[in-house]
Regions:
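Surface-exposed, charge/polar-rich loops and edge strands
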Residues: 9-124
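An anion-binding catalytic pocket shared by soluble metabolic enzymes
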Residues: 1-9
Length: 124
């Protein structure tokens, strides 16, 4: 929700012994440093449900879609993953034009490349 002010970088060496506090919004704001851009190779986003085509349902508000869009602007080849329980994989997720897809679904037992992810990353 604080995307208007940019991303916050939290480096492990800067929060030794304060990891739990640093994982909160208040802690991140106090211990982290603001950065204007972010370049990552793998982004893990939350989902309420996903389908095997790569469509995801977030919590509403579009914040996950905004985060994915900002990350992909810096690295178009970033892998967008979501970690979920297998019961959250559904037949079809309703989508709208602004919704962003995930490349990879991670469950406790396996990793599944979505149709979108296989096409985008040219995986057989």
């Amino acid at each position: 929700p604080r995307l208007k002010r940019g991303f916050i970088e939290i480096r492990p060496e800067d929060v030794k012994g304060l990891e739990k506090f640093a994982s909160t919004i208040k802690g991140a704001l106090k211990l982290g440093r603001r950065i204007s851009t972010v370049f990552v190779d793998l982004a893990v986003v939350g989902s309420v449900a996903v389908d095997l085509r790569g469509n995801r349902l977030g919590k509403g508000g579009g914040y996950g879609d905004i985060e994915i869009d900002l990350i992909m602007r810096e690295n178009p080849r970033v892998i967008i993953a979501t970690n979920i329980h297998p019961i959250q994989i559904v037949e079809k997720v309703p989508v709208s034009e602004h919704d962003k897809k995930v490349d990879l679904i991670i469950t406790p037992d396996r990793a599944i490349w979505t149709e979108w992810g296989r096409i985008r990353h040219q995986i057989g």
